[in-house]
Amino acid sequence: ASDVYKRQLTYDKFACNQYLKGFGVRIAESLLLRGGQSVTDEDVMEKIGLPCFIKPSLGGSSFGVTKVTAKEQIQPAITKAFAEAQEVLVEAFMDGTEITCGCYKTKDKSVVFPITEVVSHNEYFDYEAKYNGASDEITPARISDDLTRRVQTLTSAIYDILGAYGIIRVDYIITEGEKINLLEVNTTPGMTATSFIPQQVRAAGMEMKDVMTDIIENKFRD
């Protein structure tokens, strides 16, 4: 795939996940609805099942996301998601531990940060949990050394597959049997003091300014 195509991919959750699935990355079952396209409650129940998440396919910040637990919630959730974006994703719910891992690469090194475990006080990691502190973020995550290595290796591989530049953050959910399932790739992760990447940089014993300098200097090298 061309670099332009891969960069466009990362802005579209559905397309990006489907692309990575072709490389053997595990993802949730999902349906994509475009431009007001409708789907019956029965189709959602049969193809995806409940509970499920209905959310905009483009963008971040968890706006317009609904966790659907009953049939009568499906259509209102689709309407809510379409108010935020032209494409809507209906995605199977996966029960497990949510984690996230950051990574950046320069011409002479690859840096994969310690993993953060996300424990939301809400039913899922929504806008309130993400921005208003309604979650516990534990870095490094309380997972085995073997699983940590596997997640970091996969994060590095995803970076390469997508031809990423600068810092990316990859969100996963770990399901029974330590199975690693991709949630989404963030190519423009938050950089505020409480965001995941600065937490991971600190946990790695690094300084954010040094990381940014590294990336900027790398850009200007031949």
Per-region residue spans from a language model:
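Conserved metal-phosphate-binding beta-hairpin within the catalytic cores
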Residues: 92, 102-103, 159-191, 201
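Glycine-rich phosphate/pyrophosphate-binding beta-alpha loops
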Residues: 62, 118-121, 186-200
